[in-house]
Amino acid sequence: MPTQFKIAIDGPAASGKSSAASCLAQKLNFQRLDCGSIYRAITFIVLSEFTTLPSLDSSNVKGFIENIKICVKNQRIYFNNRDITDELRGEMIDRTVGKIAKVKYIRQKVHKIERDIIDNCKGGIVVDGRDIGTVVMPDADLKFFITASAETRAKRRCLQNESHNYDEILNEINKRDYDDIHREIDPLRQAEDAIIIKNDDITFDETIDLLIKKYNEKIHQLNK
């Protein structure tokens, strides 16, 4: 087995990739990097500074964003020595993060943060996002693309929060899928060598079992 083993997990919104990545990393005793949380952190910081989303092309906003210093430690995100991890989930951030994530200079900044973390990782790491196997970590030892139909993903979101309206959530997911797939820079797509996991008809535990099975097969192959 190589001294550093890298696993990339990509997939659309609400596919369960983040939960799967977290569980897989825990079971393998690997480090885990949630790339979506970095975009959320930048979104949170920008909204905290400007209240509403400003023009991302203006020089003062660009300068502010480029000077943001984020630290990721033990799956927690710190800004100005403050843990902001638990503040990154909310409707405003949900509605805004897609606009932040499609801006070229922001993506370049996030990619640098991600690659620095990956390069400094000792041992194994599980990295999840939307462009991991294609852009951030194309040299990953193992790549997964976790997906499900938009309808399945909307139903799961509603089960997690009964106050959600199914039709509204479905529309949001379809819009996010369209935006991710048609994004000019680093669109969502599966890597050619990724293992596709469609989890419409399997449980979360079965998904994890399948990921571990594929990992063990890869380790066996490397040890031959």
From Swiss-Prot:
Pfam families: Cytidylate_kin. It comes from the Eukaryota. It catalyses: CMP + ATP = CDP + ADP; dCMP + ATP = dCDP + ADP. GO terms for biological process: nucleobase-containing small molecule interconversion. The keyword Isomerase does not apply. HAMAP family: Cytidyl_kinase_type1. Belongs to the cytidylate kinase family. Type 1 subfamily. This is Probable cytidylate kinase. The lineage of its organism: Eukaryota, Fungi, Fungi incertae sedis, Microsporidia, Enterocytozoonidae.
